[in-house]
Amino acid sequence: MSIMSYYARQIFDETKGYEFRKSPLKAQDLDKKIYVYSAKEDKVLIGYMKVSEILKGNTTQILKSTGYDVRPDGYEIVDYYGKDFQRCCALKLYDVTEFEEYLTLKDMRRIDPNINLPQYYSYIYENDPLYDVIREWDEAFSLDGNLCENPTKQKQAILRRGIERRRK
């Protein structure tokens, strides 16, 4: 999922418990890892999060349901969606896990030169060369207590394997 860097940082600082969208996720994606691409300034895969609930309604309802109606930054949502936007969605986030090392867009393009990271989200399937790279990256660099001993060496090895798989 692509998220502007400013909001991605808030998610991983755990000061933002909801991600607001115009379109909801599919129900099948609830409680699954959703990898976050920090767009705009950063251009990196920063970590993952899970969504436990999808709230839908107009802007006012969603702001109240999430508590953003009393937060100082609640006005940003109204500014973006409009006061009476009828199809506002809020994704309730949990298990937010940042990577020790970020996977850059430049490195992703070494694996898949045609990668397209849309504004909302895209699926990366098992037959995609990036699938195994992201899975290995997650195992090696998730800040969940399982840190690797030599991040630089591990990063190079994961990217090398990804490039080799792409060539096959």
PLM regions: where:
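Short coil-to-beta transition motif at edge beta-strands of beta-rich domains
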Residues: 26-37
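Contiguous surface segments at macromolecular interaction interfaces
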Residues: 3-25, 41-46, 54-168
